[in-house]
Regions:
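Conserved glycine-rich cofactor-binding loop
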Residues: 11-12
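Substrate-binding pocket helix/loop in short-chain dehydrogenase/reductase
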Residues: 83-84, 88-96, 178, 189
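Active-site helix of classical SDR
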Residues: 107, 143, 151
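Alpha-helical segment proximal to the catalytic Tyr-Lys
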Residues: 112, 156-160, 217
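Residue(s) in the substrate-gating loop at a strand-loop-helix junction
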Residues: 127
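Short C-terminal tail/terminal secondary-structure segment
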Residues: 132, 209, 220-234
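A conserved structural motif in NAD(P)-dependent oxidoreductases
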Residues: 193-204, 215
């Protein structure tokens, strides 16, 4: 059955891989993007998830073209890495506002239609860093760890309405972010991963697709690591 799906930050990397995977399975997929080029073959809506009005406008456009959102993947996120003593308050709050509060904004808006339908799937894209920590990423780790508490609270709050909330925690993945690392940095990072390689975006997408499926109807409040064993789920 074709569903209305919305993926935030779905114009590149992991978000785009998820969008392509679900679209190929027959879903009506829309993605939000803040910068860059919109992907071809998908309904792309420009939206800054730190702006509540833009979030509402994006949902209205998706609802008009695809119907109420039945599957939400909160993927949009940013990094502003810096050691604590050099990290400004803006560096911290901007990352939290995008990665955590942004997820709150889109979840709250999506819940309207899901509550009426008495069903829905919400998947948050966190990070292995949220579970194991990382020097220089206190802001990012805090924002991504916050998604776990948020998802589990929502699972308890709205579970009786047939809406599931789960978290996927990817490890280092083959995206533009990892491509910015030097060969030496990559090799050093690989030594910390039991499987000895980076994740492919398609592997993250397959996990999200499962959690959004009927086969996962009895899974909620879960955190699924897709990190090659780097964090072991913690």
């Amino acid at each position: 059955m074709s569903r209305s799906v919305l993926i935030t930050g779905g114009n590149r990397g992991i978000g785009l891989a998820i969008a392509r995977h679900l679209a190929e399975a027959g879903d009506r997929v829309a993605v939000t993007y803040r910068s860059g080029e919109p992907p071809e073959g998908l309904l792309a809506v420009r939206c800054d998830i730190t702006d509540t009005d833009q979030v509402d406008a994006a949902f209205k456009e998706v609802e008009e073209q695809h119907g109420p959102v039945e599957v939400l993947v909160a993927n949009a996120g940013i990094t502003k890495d810096q050691l604590l003593m050099r990290m400004s308050e803006d560096d911290f709050t901007t990352v939290v506002d995008t990665n955590l509060t942004g997820a709150f904004r889109v979840t709250k808006r999506a819940s309207r239609g899901m509550l009426r339908a008495k069903k829905g799937r919400v998947v948050f894209i966190s990070s292995a860093v949220a579970l194991r920590g990382e020097s220089g990423q206190a802001n990012y780790a805090a924002s991504k760890a916050g998604l776990v508490g948020f998802a589990r609270s929502m699972a308890r709050e709205l579970g009786s309405r047939g809406i599931t909330f789960n978290v996927v925690a990817p490890g280092l993945t083959e995206t533009s972010m990892s491509q910015a690392l030097s060969d030496e940095q990559l090799e050093n990072l690989k030594t910390q991963i039991p499987l000895g390689r980076l994740a492919r975006p398609e592997e993250i997408a397959a996990t999200v697709a499962f959690l959004a499926s009927e086969q996962a109807a009895y899974i909620t409040g879960a955190v699924v690591p897709v990190d090659g064993g780097a964090g072991m789920g913690h």
